[in-house]
């Protein structure tokens, strides 16, 4: 008899284990998604920053492997045109540009489009088995078209109100993103501080509030965390930081080393890289930019302006200006191939479930 709880979600997703690899735009790869799905989980592609050609190529690569996968997109609001904040940001970044020999800070541009008609057409053409969204859901017509195509949909919520709104819009399952999670907060309500709810508290409240499956995310790094999430009523878990040190990820070697050396108290929520709140490991840039939040332009404008800093830092082999996105479970990172990591997580989870089942 299986130790895993009965789960309609795994059946619907076509996976053996209720373990989903977080999309992580910029760090996910087709190789990572294929490895996770081959091992029985659900691999994901973070496509928010992809060109159309790269988007279609990556989806085709994973699809050709015959494994289920999740295609993820950002659904952010269009940035507000604020010349004063744009000028402030350029002034703040200018010393770093000079230090790294990058010349003048470029004019403010938007280089990461929100989910749009071009993305929609790609989704309808490629038909990924699962389509997920961060920062809310697309407009009603686009979302209706995705649902009409029979694609399974996910979106992130950082509090109960967001989860209820997603269910009301017709999403198939909600990702309950606890405050411990690394990377961008999926919040789409204001102020974002309403999403400062830890995974242990958030998951059961969301489970009680909605009738759709709930996927737990945030601070889950081993089998103990997976078993705990299932005990709280989650139908599955989503892990991001745990897979960043897998060789199949696109994480820079310095990024991997920082994760391996991380402490439990080393992450911070910051707007300084992108203009949206995101959790990452503290470095020089985060320390020096602290307190300047009022001067940051909206996402994704600031993300575009800091892009050259991140690239130069990687080329220069230092972490001063890298966005080291990480959850609070980084200390649990293992340097294993993704397939081996999933197998280990399954073994760890089953060990915990067996111990709990036989406890007196």
Which ranges hold each PLM region?
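Active-site entrance/lid segments in N-terminal catalytic domains of soluble metabolic enzymes
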Residues: 1-209, 345
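Conserved active-site-proximal phosphate/metal-binding subdomains
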Residues: 96, 184-189, 193-215, 220-360
């Amino acid at each position: 008899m299986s130790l895993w709880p009965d789960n309609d979600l795994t059946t619907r997703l076509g996976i053996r284990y209720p373990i989903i690899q977080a999309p992580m735009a910029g760090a996910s790869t087709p190789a990572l998604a294929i490895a996770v799905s081959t091992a029985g989980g659900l691999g994901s592609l973070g496509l928010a920053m992809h060109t159309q050609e790269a988007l279609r190529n990556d989806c085709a690569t994973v699809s050709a492997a015959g494994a289920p996968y999740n295609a993820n997109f950002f659904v952010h609001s269009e940035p507000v045109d604020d010349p004063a904040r744009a000028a402030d940001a350029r002034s703040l970044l200018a010393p770093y540009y000079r230090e790294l020999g990058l010349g003048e800070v470029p004019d403010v541009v938007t280089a990461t489009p929100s989910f749009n008609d071009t993305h929609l057409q790609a989704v309808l053409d490629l038909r990924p088995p699962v389509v997920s969204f961060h920062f809310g859901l697309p407009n009603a017509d686009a979302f209706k078209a995705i649902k009409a195509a029979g694609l399974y949909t996910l979106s992130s919520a950082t509090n109960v109100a967001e989860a209820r709104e997603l269910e009301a819009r017709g999403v198939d399952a909600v990702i309950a993103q606890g405050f411990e999670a690394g990377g961008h907060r999926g919040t789409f309500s204001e102020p974002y501080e309403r999403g400062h709810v830890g995974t242990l508290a958030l998951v059961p409240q969301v489970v009680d509030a909605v009738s759709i499956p709930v996927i737990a995310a945030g601070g889950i790094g081993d089998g103990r965390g997976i078993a705990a999430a299932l005990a709280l009523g989650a139908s599955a878990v989503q892990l991001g930081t745990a897979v960043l040190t897998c060789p199949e990820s696109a994480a820079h070697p310095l990024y991997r080393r920082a994760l391996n050396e991380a402490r439990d108290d080393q992450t911070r929520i910051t707007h300084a890289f992108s203009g949206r709140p995101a959790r990452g490991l503290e470095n020089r840039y985060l320390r020096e930019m602290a307190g300047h939040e009022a001067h940051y332009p909206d996402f994704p404008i600031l993300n575009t302006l800091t892009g050259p800093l991140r690239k130069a830092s990687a080329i220069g082999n230092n972490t001063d200006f890298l966005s080291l996105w990480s959850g609070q479970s980084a200390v649990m990172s293992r340097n294993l191939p993704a397939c081996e990591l999933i197998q280990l997580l399954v073994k760890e989870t089953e060990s915990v479930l067996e111990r709990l089942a036989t406890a007196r």
